[in-house]
Amino acid sequence: MKKILLIATGGTIASTTGKHGLSPTVSAGELLGFVPEINNFCTADYIQPYNIDSTNITPAHWLKLAAAIRENYDDYDGFVVCHGTDTMAYTAAVLSYLIQNSKKPIVLTGSQKPIDLEDTDARINLRDAFSYAASDKSAQTTIVFQGKAIAGTRAKKIRTKSFNAFESVDFPILGTVRDGRVVQYIEPPESVKKAVSPAFYERLDGRVGLCCLTPGFSGAVLDAYFENNDAVVLSGYGTGGIPGGEYYDLYDVIEKWRGKGKTLVVTTQVQSEGSDMGIYRVGRDFKERFSVLESYDMTWESIITKLMWILSETRDEKEIERLFYKPVNYDLIV
């Protein structure tokens, strides 16, 4: 029988209603009490490194969570992380980079309604997460939600209230869980199967900013982003179009920061199908003039957290580029 560790961090799944609205109050042990049926296929222990609304998550929380998994890694066959849905995709992505090539599954789940409500989605999500964590075919970091297993770098919350809150962006789901039965569609990659042990990382550079272009956007805003961040993710239009000309002044701002150790990544505001800056002149001219990284089919969550990991490891421009384009947990199709 598999031995699974529940790591409770708060979120809606652990919330109760007070005079100021929902807030996390339910303990890890109490969460397990709602799903006694998991004892039929695994044994479960629990820890609770923090109990927060996931809106308040910081890189320090992520490092604490990764450390909890690292410290318990040898003692368990898998891990289930209860988490708020609002930033779950960010946490799943960052764990993919902080704990690479894990043969043991690290499964995030949560709910759109608190676990103590009669019409909640929490109990089935939690049960499914344990089923997936106990499966012989699962590995790496995933989100299990509404019966779908989604790679940690491909998940995005696309609905604020519906139970079917998450989708896998530009990549198939890894598998499904129905009535405790796991159907695995995509096997773990060879890099995971061949790994003797996972690669654990213990640092993040939180100075990564996401800057979204809008018609009328001021170059002064981009300048402030460069001033206050080590990397800027510039979200352009369509396939990665970046406006030129004196009105926007973006070229002059980027020229100003050129050679000052800043990393610039261009992505798209469109959720599906990624960037392709070579199609239109507004993208091609920009990419040819400046040394920028292009995100292609990566999600915002993966771009940002991957940069946090990379910049904590190196500031060498060539090494940053190499690591950025190195696929991790299905984050990039090359």
List each language-model region with its residue ranges.
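ATP/NTP phosphate-donor binding region
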Residues: 1-71, 272
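Accessory alpha-helical/coil subdomains and C-terminal extensions
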Residues: 2, 7-11, 15, 27-38, ...
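Short beta-strand segments
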Residues: 7-9, 81-83, 107-110, 142-146, ...
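Short acidic, glycine/serine/threonine-rich loops at helix termini
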Residues: 17-20, 92-93, 118-121, 151-157, ...
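Short Gly/Thr/Asp-enriched flexible loops that form oxyanion-binding sites at enzyme active sites
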Residues: 82-104, 244-253
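Short, acidic/small-residue loops that bind anionic groups at enzyme active sites
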Residues: 92-123, 130-136, 257-268
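Internal gly/pro-rich beta-alpha loop/helix module
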Residues: 108-179
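C-terminal non-catalytic interaction/assembly regions of soluble proteins
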Residues: 239-334
